A protein has these predicted regions:
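Conserved N-terminal beta-strand and adjoining loop/helix that marks the start
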Residues: 1-22, 92
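A generic structural micro-feature
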Residues: 5-7, 81-87, 106
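Conserved Nudix-box catalytic region and its N-terminal flanking loop in Nudix hydrolases
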Residues: 17, 21-57
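Short loop segments at secondary-structure junctions
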Residues: 17-20, 28, 92-99, 114-116
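A short coil-to-beta-strand element that immediately follows conserved catalytic motifs
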Residues: 62-71
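Active-site-adjacent beta-strand/loop module that shapes the phosphate/pyrophosphate-binding cleft
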Residues: 72-99
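NUDIX/MutT-family hydrolases
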Residues: 92, 101-133
Length: 139
């Protein structure tokens, strides 16, 4: 891959099941940390469309009722497996299923309460958005 010229626009998807539990994944991209599904917004794609697509690709889940949480800047964080500059747009959403089908980007998953999530090793960006959700700071 060529050197990065511009920040990359990405989306993070905070998926809640009908029991109010949050889906967290472990990925080789964030060693030892829990994260949420997500990825790049493709050219010509709306951010919400990217969230729906990424959730389906990474988990097999259909999502609905997307609510914007926040955006965060990620500039060359050594916690990530590559030197990148991202702009994250995070969304909370719902799913009617708990049948997760992981693709090759994740190694394992858990459904947890928000309270339990706060006690897990999450990356800084995921933790920030979880704390905003707990505080009720959704747009």
């Amino acid at each position: 891959m060529a050197d990065q010229v511009f920040p990359e626009l990405t989306v993070g998807v905070f998926i809640f099941n009908e029991a109010g539990e949050l889906l967290l994944l472990k990925s080789h991209k964030w060693p030892g940390k829990y994260v949420v599904p997500g990825g790049h917004v493709e050219l010509g794609e709306r951010i919400e469309e990217a969230a729906i697509r990424e959730a389906k690709e990474e988990t097999g889940l259909d999502i609905y009722d997307l609510k914007f949480i926040n955006f965060q800047q990620f500039i060359y964080d050594p916690a990530f497996w590559k030197k990148r500059h991202f702009i994250f747009f995070d969304y909370a959403c719902k799913t009617g299923s708990v049948e997760v089908k992981l693709n090759d980007e994740a190694e394992e998953y858990v459904w947890v309460s928000l309270e339990a999530a706060l006690h897990l090793p999450m990356d800084t960006y995921t933790r920030t958005s979880v704390e905003l959700i707990v505080a009720g700071n959704l747009s």
